[in-house]
Amino acid sequence: MLEGWVGRGESVHLEFGILYHGALERFDRLRYDGASHDEALYTVIRETLIATWREGRPWRAAKDLNPDDKASLKCRENLIRTIVWYADKFRNDPAATKVTADGPMVELHFLFEIDKIYSLCGYLDRIVTFQDQPFVMDRKSTTSTLGSYYFDQYDPDNQMSLYTVASQVAFKTPVKGVIVDAAQIAVGFSRFVRSFVFKTPDQIDEWMRDLGYWLHQAEYFVEKNYWPQNDKSCHKYGGCVFRGICSKSPSVRDKFLESSFERRLWNPLIIR
């Protein structure tokens, strides 16, 4: 990240997630603007079909993918199905999007300082009211089976704590935690499970205190211009894209980087 290296090929899971989130954000906004369920869904599916028609052919058509590769589940047909089924599953969603003078609280960019030299930034999918209580809603898509093993990874979790803090600080909304809306993409079906991650004020205080220690450690690495490997994290979340580079001798890593990656500096402060 510091040097701006990114893979030359497409990140299938990232692209699928961007398309899925974008479609649901658009659906939420259309519903707020007065479109009926069917009108909003028709518009979203049409726009998604257009967005996934690239260079004269469908993006990741199922017939073009190796069915033995689990990533083949992240295909155009399954994307469309998952959008439609999610919208139908939550047609009468008890989690209602909160609305402010600026409109519906969906796809919210946040940026706030935590001291004089550090800022936290990112995006929230949605802020909702559920049973008269405010929550952040985070939508996930996965090929994993949805059960306790899957949802346990989000509590405790850095992202869930950050989203809770961001809602409370940047949007002055004292949320109780995060609702995780997960979509399982499988052969022939998409399945949805809703789970809750609750955060108490004491937990948030602890997370902020711990964050200060991690940032202090990062300062030390900057001063030494050396970032040690954390090789216990190399295989998490589908595996780090740099595993193949880090497994090489330090003396030859640059050559492998240049052949498989390209430099593309990312500025998280730029609103997408």
Language-model features and meaning:
Residues 1, 133-140, 212-219:
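Active-site-adjacent bridging/hinge elements
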Residues 1-32, 107, 239-242:
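Nuclease catalytic cores
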Residues 7, 11-14, 150-154, 231:
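Short, solvent-exposed segments of well-ordered alpha helices
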Residues 12, 16, 75, 79, ...:
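Hydrophobic (often cysteine-bearing) scaffold residues that line and stabilize catalytic clefts
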Residues 22, 26, 81, 85, ...:
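Residue-level signal for well-ordered alpha-helical scaffold segments within enzymatic catalytic domains
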Residues 23-106:
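A non-catalytic, helix-rich entry segment at domain boundaries
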Residues 39-43, 73, 152-155, 164-272:
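Metal-dependent nuclease catalytic regions and adjoining charged, substrate-binding loops involved
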Residues 102-164, 168:
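Non-catalytic protein-protein interaction segments used by genome-maintenance enzymes to assemble
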